[in-house]
């Protein structure tokens, strides 16, 4: 996981299909991976803003960890698509410079989604993200992908 740790930024076309999203236009993405509890787990956060409106498009957190009982890698999280709350969980695989999540999600309104996210480290400062096999309440949605650059700017707290 170490090569993924840090902040990643991009501008991209908006993805659609999830309840609460405005489905067209450009979005600004900030994704961050950081270690938790002596490198026993990783927190992944997303903050995505719709460029035209300045409104929240997606925000959320996921915890990436190993299940002590099974030894398998797992993902669980929560957040908002627009103003619609969701929670999700899934499995995780790490293959060389690629992380693959297979996610199940449900919104506060009981909308159910399934999707796969592939995060590939193409270079030390270049991360590609693909969202595929997206189904919302059983209806297939368009795949989506973008490339993010490592944010090397530092800010003081």
Go through the PLM ranges and name each one.
Residues 1-157:
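Hydrophobic small-molecule pocket/channel-lining residues, especially in calycin-type beta-barrels
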């Amino acid at each position: 996981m170490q090569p993924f740790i840090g902040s990643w930024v991009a501008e991209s076309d908006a993805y659609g299909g999830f309840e609460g999203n405005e489905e067209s236009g450009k979005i600004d993405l900030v994704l961050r991976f950081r270690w938790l509890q002596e490198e026993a787990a990783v927190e992944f956060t997303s903050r995505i803003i719709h460029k035209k409106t300045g409104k929240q498009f997606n925000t959320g957190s996921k915890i990436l960890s190993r299940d002590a009982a099974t030894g398998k890698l797992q993902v669980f999280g929560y957040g908002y698509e627009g103003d619609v709350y969701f929670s999700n969980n899934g499995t995780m695989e790490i293959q060389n410079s690629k992380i693959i999540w297979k996610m199940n999600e449900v919104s506060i309104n009981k909308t159910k989604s399934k999707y796969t996210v592939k995060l590939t480290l193409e270079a030390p400062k270049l991360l590609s993200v693909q969202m595929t096999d997206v189904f919302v309440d059983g209806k297939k949605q368009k795949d989506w992908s973008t490339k993010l650059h490592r944010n090397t700017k530092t800010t003081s707290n």
